[in-house]
């Protein structure tokens, strides 16, 4: 204590000030470690969480369907169900013609070798494709996990087949390149005994959820810290059976990825297009007008399968022009575009899939300014044609046209010019000449170029500033 009448010494004041600053700093650290608000395990609360901005800015991702279904590689990734769940004759005939009598689906497990899986090469390909995020199947409806799940004994990629942690290896390679990592996870497993027991009980019991689904989801989040969880396999049961809201409240409040993680909408019957971080609604969903909620179109280069299949015909492969058109339309309507490939059982991405990805990457390297981090404009497409789609970024408006007009003049009815209007074409030096017509609107003279000098194939971008 100070003696009576002793004055406060400056050194003591400095010490108290230092302690106060340390206390305030610690308080701020605690505050930052906590979410701005706590989300309760109900949809009104969970749906109120703002979507992390990175997802809307990303626009384009690559989807990967890879698992034991890549071994028979015939029909689709639903091979096991089509063969033994529904007993489709063509699948039974395929097994009789190609495999020994008495073969089981489990026999395919050791043949899922991934011997040529080089995650660095995959990551280089996805980066060259222009992908800002990648979503890998950690477990499809067959139940085989592509990581050493502690609750999937002898039916995971560490115990059987590759003897590798496929999820972990790809994540490491992607993050070296600043590509966001998403994990696809199927809630159900077609033939798991506990799931079949719960199904027999009318989903009044939750043996499977407690022993398998929830432990795996928590393990994936804590082990790999994903940027995105792409849930699937929800359709047979309500979200109350899956305990979805309890998991999501933990994910948003207390998980190691609570601030950045994004989820989709497949968390139970009737959740799709109604609840979740963003909406898939259904596979290959295409809205007819601008939705009021963030959404994603997931589609596949192989039109009839998500997994690799040996019976894919060339006519089954989506054309480059269609892929670019779908991307443009999706982004114009405020969505993200998730394009799927299916690697082989050996871990190879077949050349035709690589070619499609690289073609899209080349187009994005020229026109990406109009795609990444863009926002929908007040008009999404020209009503007199479906070949011109709009995006915007700041004060700039981008008109992406899918067909080069024969007369070399692009007609845009929607933009309103001003005294400060400037118009250019991405990757072409200088401003373009333009005029207005009271009946036709804005008329833009496109550059007269030899084919070798045209900056892109299949779609081109006009950048407009100073328009309304």
From Swiss-Prot:
<feature type="glycosylation site" description="N-linked (GlcNAc...) asparagine">
    <location>
        <position position="243"/>
    </location>
</feature>
<dbReference type="InterPro" id="IPR000933">
    <property type="entry name" value="Glyco_hydro_29"/>
</dbReference>
<dbReference type="GO" id="GO:0005764">
    <property type="term" value="C:lysosome"/>
</dbReference>
<comment type="function">
    <text>Alpha-L-fucosidase is responsible for hydrolyzing the alpha-1,6-linked fucose joined to the reducing-end N-acetylglucosamine of the carbohydrate moieties of glycoproteins.</text>
</comment>
<dbReference type="InterPro" id="IPR017853">
    <property type="entry name" value="Glycoside_hydrolase_SF"/>
</dbReference>
<comment type="subunit">
    <text>Homotetramer.</text>
</comment>
<keyword id="KW-0732">Signal</keyword>
<keyword id="KW-0443">Lipid metabolism</keyword>
<dbReference type="GO" id="GO:0016139">
    <property type="term" value="P:glycoside catabolic process"/>
</dbReference>
<dbReference type="InterPro" id="IPR016286">
    <property type="entry name" value="FUC_metazoa-typ"/>
</dbReference>
<dbReference type="GO" id="GO:0006004">
    <property type="term" value="P:fucose metabolic process"/>
</dbReference>
<keyword id="KW-0325">Glycoprotein</keyword>
<dbReference type="GO" id="GO:0004560">
    <property type="term" value="F:alpha-L-fucosidase activity"/>
</dbReference>
<dbReference type="Pfam" id="PF16757">
    <property type="entry name" value="Fucosidase_C"/>
</dbReference>
<dbReference type="InterPro" id="IPR018526">
    <property type="entry name" value="Glyco_hydro_29_CS"/>
</dbReference>
<keyword id="KW-0597">Phosphoprotein</keyword>
<keyword id="KW-0458">Lysosome</keyword>
<protein>
    <recommendedName>
        <fullName>Tissue alpha-L-fucosidase</fullName>
        <ecNumber>3.2.1.51</ecNumber>
    </recommendedName>
</protein>
<feature type="glycosylation site" description="N-linked (GlcNAc...) asparagine">
    <location>
        <position position="384"/>
    </location>
</feature>
<feature type="modified residue" description="Phosphothreonine">
    <location>
        <position position="172"/>
    </location>
</feature>
<dbReference type="Pfam" id="PF01120">
    <property type="entry name" value="Alpha_L_fucos"/>
</dbReference>
<dbReference type="InterPro" id="IPR031919">
    <property type="entry name" value="Fucosidase_C"/>
</dbReference>
<feature type="signal peptide">
    <location>
        <begin position="1"/>
        <end position="29"/>
    </location>
</feature>
<dbReference type="GO" id="GO:0006629">
    <property type="term" value="P:lipid metabolic process"/>
</dbReference>
<feature type="site" description="May be important for catalysis">
    <location>
        <position position="298"/>
    </location>
</feature>
<dbReference type="InterPro" id="IPR013780">
    <property type="entry name" value="Glyco_hydro_b"/>
</dbReference>
<comment type="similarity">
    <text>Belongs to the glycosyl hydrolase 29 family.</text>
</comment>
<keyword id="KW-0378">Hydrolase</keyword>
<keyword id="KW-0326">Glycosidase</keyword>
<feature type="glycosylation site" description="N-linked (GlcNAc...) asparagine">
    <location>
        <position position="270"/>
    </location>
</feature>
